[in-house]
Amino acid sequence: MLSSVALRYLLVLSLAFLAVVTSSRTQSRFASYELMGTEGTECVTTKTISQICYQCATRHEDSFVQVYQECCKKEMGLREYCEEIYTELPIRSGLWQPNK
Protein backbone atom coordinates (compact mmCIF):
# COMPACT_ATOMS: atom_id res chain seq x y z
CA MET A 1 0.00 0.00 0.00
CA LEU A 2 1.24 3.52 -0.77
CA SER A 3 2.45 5.63 2.11
CA SER A 4 0.61 8.81 3.05
CA VAL A 5 3.49 10.90 1.65
CA ALA A 6 3.25 9.09 -1.69
CA LEU A 7 -0.53 9.50 -1.76
CA ARG A 8 -0.23 13.20 -0.96
CA TYR A 9 2.42 13.58 -3.68
CA LEU A 10 0.15 11.90 -6.24
CA LEU A 11 -2.79 14.05 -5.17
CA VAL A 12 -0.75 17.26 -5.51
CA LEU A 13 0.46 16.22 -8.96
CA SER A 14 -3.07 15.32 -10.04
CA LEU A 15 -4.41 18.65 -8.90
CA ALA A 16 -1.50 20.48 -10.49
CA PHE A 17 -2.42 18.81 -13.77
CA LEU A 18 -6.02 19.88 -13.26
CA ALA A 19 -4.83 23.44 -12.71
CA VAL A 20 -2.92 23.31 -16.00
CA VAL A 21 -5.96 22.02 -17.87
CA THR A 22 -8.34 24.60 -16.42
CA SER A 23 -5.97 27.58 -16.40
CA SER A 24 -7.71 29.32 -19.29
CA ARG A 25 -10.98 29.62 -17.40
CA THR A 26 -11.96 32.70 -15.44
CA GLN A 27 -10.79 33.33 -11.91
CA SER A 28 -14.33 32.73 -10.64
CA ARG A 29 -13.91 29.08 -11.62
CA PHE A 30 -11.23 28.87 -8.92
CA ALA A 31 -13.45 30.23 -6.15
CA SER A 32 -13.98 26.75 -4.72
CA TYR A 33 -10.21 26.32 -4.35
CA GLU A 34 -9.81 29.09 -1.75
CA LEU A 35 -7.82 28.14 1.30
CA MET A 36 -9.93 26.19 3.75
CA GLY A 37 -7.73 26.76 6.80
CA THR A 38 -6.41 23.27 7.46
CA GLU A 39 -3.14 21.75 6.36
CA GLY A 40 -4.77 18.89 4.48
CA THR A 41 -6.97 21.10 2.34
CA GLU A 42 -4.30 23.77 1.84
CA CYS A 43 -2.05 21.18 0.23
CA VAL A 44 -4.58 20.45 -2.50
CA THR A 45 -5.70 23.92 -3.56
CA THR A 46 -4.78 25.46 -6.88
CA LYS A 47 -3.61 28.54 -5.03
CA THR A 48 -1.09 26.72 -2.88
CA ILE A 49 0.04 24.34 -5.61
CA SER A 50 1.41 27.35 -7.48
CA GLN A 51 3.20 28.55 -4.37
CA ILE A 52 4.52 25.06 -3.59
CA CYS A 53 5.82 24.67 -7.13
CA TYR A 54 7.49 28.07 -7.06
CA GLN A 55 9.18 27.30 -3.78
CA CYS A 56 10.24 23.81 -4.89
CA ALA A 57 11.46 24.93 -8.29
CA THR A 58 13.53 27.80 -6.90
CA ARG A 59 14.70 25.87 -3.83
CA HIS A 60 13.72 28.60 -1.39
CA GLU A 61 13.21 26.20 1.49
CA ASP A 62 14.29 28.85 3.99
CA SER A 63 11.24 30.94 3.10
CA PHE A 64 8.74 28.07 3.35
CA VAL A 65 5.86 28.41 5.73
CA GLN A 66 4.93 25.18 7.45
CA VAL A 67 2.27 24.08 4.97
CA TYR A 68 4.67 24.29 2.00
CA GLN A 69 7.26 22.25 3.87
CA GLU A 70 4.61 19.64 4.59
CA CYS A 71 3.33 19.54 1.00
CA CYS A 72 6.70 19.54 -0.74
CA LYS A 73 8.78 17.38 1.61
CA LYS A 74 11.79 18.05 -0.66
CA GLU A 75 10.48 15.45 -3.12
CA MET A 76 12.74 15.47 -6.18
CA GLY A 77 9.92 14.31 -8.44
CA LEU A 78 7.78 17.27 -7.41
CA ARG A 79 10.73 19.65 -7.78
CA GLU A 80 11.48 18.41 -11.29
CA TYR A 81 7.81 18.66 -12.28
CA CYS A 82 7.60 22.18 -10.91
CA GLU A 83 10.82 23.32 -12.57
CA GLU A 84 9.17 22.68 -15.93
CA ILE A 85 6.29 25.03 -15.05
CA TYR A 86 7.40 27.81 -12.70
CA THR A 87 10.38 30.11 -12.94
CA GLU A 88 9.01 33.17 -11.17
CA LEU A 89 6.67 33.98 -8.33
CA PRO A 90 3.04 33.21 -9.28
CA ILE A 91 0.78 36.16 -10.02
CA ARG A 92 -3.00 36.69 -9.78
CA SER A 93 -3.17 36.09 -6.02
CA GLY A 94 -1.13 32.92 -6.26
CA LEU A 95 -3.04 31.20 -9.06
CA TRP A 96 -0.68 29.37 -11.34
CA GLN A 97 0.90 30.92 -14.42
CA PRO A 98 2.78 28.72 -16.93
CA ASN A 99 6.18 29.50 -18.40
CA LYS A 100 5.86 30.89 -21.89
UniProtKB/Swiss-Prot annotation:
Expressed by the yellow cells, peptidergic (neuroendocrine) neurons of the central nervous system. Keywords: Disulfide bond, Hormone, Signal. Three disulfide bonds are present. GO terms for molecular function: hormone activity. Residues 1-23 form the signal peptide. Stimulates integumental Na(+) uptake. Controls the activity of sodium pumps in the integument, pericardium, ureter and nephridial gland. This is Sodium-influx-stimulating peptide.
